[in-house]
């Protein structure tokens, strides 16, 4: 097999003192119960903050997990490691033909995990009902602007209508609450935030605005060029009354604000300016079978090699535990020596 190099060291050291049973824990006592599963690195958009206009060299098909391999890892995660929430991501998960099969197989596990999907919404209008029937509980749809010109400039595709149709279909199919994930453009983002919130309020969607993170394929991210939570909230407050939500945040990444005295909320995920790593409960599985204990991890643990080498479930479970045991205290974005991970977001999964 020819392996596409991603420049990421692989964990090979033993994890001294690591628990071999019980929750999926790290040395700081954080317990991972939320699994992010990247089904593919392919995407049908070319968002400026994610990849170049010409796209990327996709991972070869033989390096990707098969549906059966993925389902086996999902079973281990849920029945042995205590995973209670599974989110399917990409790339773009809707380009994966066996998506509904994987969702259905995951829903058949016991205890049944909560299942969500993050998607750009293109093609969702045609598949929302089938995904709901397969067992998917809810969706987050990435939408950075409801201005057609802004959307086309950000995504390099004229597909806003398809995304809006996907949102409507998801709501109709019962994939609720429907959430909208927005990464704001530095030039138009403050205006876009206001119009996005109005659109979401009008249609019954929940808006989540995410600070742009250094995960772009071209490594062009600049702290000073990205909009941060304080500025975003100030722009929203010029048009809406925002009151902090009284519900405990727990491990949720979004700080929620109630809008105009009603029950609707808007969330801001301040991954860079107000990191929440101490409450992180996530573990990540890439489309090519690598476990990552953080979006910004510099190391990975290769479960695909174990799968294809004949390892039993016990060995795979312990390898996954070892990967999470060594999770760093935080992502380190604000540290002087921070290095952006070699994998772009499209090959990690959101």
Swiss-Prot record:
Q: Which residues bind [4Fe-4S] cluster 1?
A: 43, 47, 50
* Reaction catalysed by this enzyme: GTP + AH2 + S-adenosyl-L-methionine = (8S)-3',8-cyclo-7,8-dihydroguanosine 5'-triphosphate + 5'-deoxyadenosine + L-methionine + A + H(+)
Q: Which residues form the Radical SAM core domain?
A: 27-245
Per UniProt, the enzyme's principal EC class comes to lyase
* GO BP terms: Mo-molybdopterin cofactor biosynthetic process
Q: Which residues bind [4Fe-4S] cluster 2 per the record?
A: 277, 280, 294
Q: Please verify whether the record's keywords include Ribonucleoprotein.
A: no
Give the enzyme's EC designation. Answer: 4.1.99.22
> What's a Pfam family in this record?
Mob_synth_C
Q: Where does GTP bind?
A: 36, 87, 118, 179, 282-284
| SUPFAM superfamilies referenced in this protein's UniProt entry, alphabetically | Radical SAM enzymes (SSF102114)
Q: Which GO terms describe its molecular function?
A: 4 iron, 4 sulfur cluster binding; cyclic pyranopterin monophosphate synthase activity; GTP 3',8'-cyclase activity; GTP binding; metal ion binding; S-adenosyl-L-methionine binding
Signal peptide as annotated in the record = none
Q: Name the positions where S-adenosyl-L-methionine binds.
A: 49, 91, 142, 213
Query: Which InterPro entries does the entry link to?
Result: Aldolase_TIM, Elp3/MiaA/NifB-like_rSAM, MoaA, MoaA_NifB_PqqE_Fe-S-bd_CS, MoaA_twitch, MoCo_biosynth_MoaA/MoaC, rSAM
Keyword list (alphabetical) reads: 4Fe-4S, GTP-binding, Iron, Iron-sulfur, Lyase, Metal-binding, Molybdenum cofactor biosynthesis, Nucleotide-binding, S-adenosyl-L-methionine
**Details of cofactor binding:** Binds 2 [4Fe-4S] clusters. Binds 1 [4Fe-4S] cluster coordinated with 3 cysteines and an exchangeable S-adenosyl-L-methionine and 1 [4Fe-4S] cluster coordinated with 3 cysteines and the GTP-derived substrate.
Quote the function comment for this protein: Catalyzes the cyclization of GTP to (8S)-3',8-cyclo-7,8-dihydroguanosine 5'-triphosphate.
Query: What protein family is recorded?
Result: Belongs to the radical SAM superfamily. MoaA family.
The protein's assembly and partners: Monomer and homodimer.
Q: What is this protein called?
A: GTP 3',8-cyclase
